[in-house]
Amino acid sequence: YKRTSNPMMNRPVVKAELVEWMRSSQTQITGELAEVLKFAKENNIPVIPHETVIYFQMLLSLLQPKRILEIGTAIGFSALIMAQEVPNAEIVTIDRNPEMIELAKKNLGKYDHRNQIILKEGDAADILKELSGSFDVIFMDSAKSKYIEFLPIALDLLSENGVILMDDIFQGGEILTPIMEIKRNQRALERGLRKLFDEVLDNPKYLTSILPLGDGLLMIKKA
């Protein structure tokens, strides 16, 4: 699974000792989802880190969303975390990686006890256009260069008071590095993220917040 790993996962922007304290001091994942997490760690599959899990649990508890959209299922860990926190919510999750889809189907089949989660297979750009209704929470954890492309469709799908969450936006701090100093194969990703920041961070159409959780979490809400 090495090709699925995020090289920025182990480059915390926040002081490493503080990250470790946050991850070890807050309530740990137990039971069935601990098995999913264990598999991810043993196989170097990127899933949301523990400090982000805790934040999601708090946020979802407060928002009580009826419908959640996730772009980037991976092995289904984050979708299962969300399902556990809001047992009455419908969760639609999208992925196109056959290897991840196979693992996600296995995990959802075992642990999605209330059949809350709908897995859609294929390119998110196509599937997003086919979705109907609105979503109260939209979580993007997929190709970072595509976030800016997905944003207009996500905004159309977002409920009036809904929130969009975009993961891994710090890229280990490389967002501060001049483009030409970044490895060539990472430049498209960085350009996509910078276009996103130019669009949303100082735009009166949006309320935004950047949280230093994991490799950076961007929150967007319609103003």
What are these regions (language model features)?
Residues 1-139, 144-165, 169-223:
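A short alpha-helical cap/connector motif
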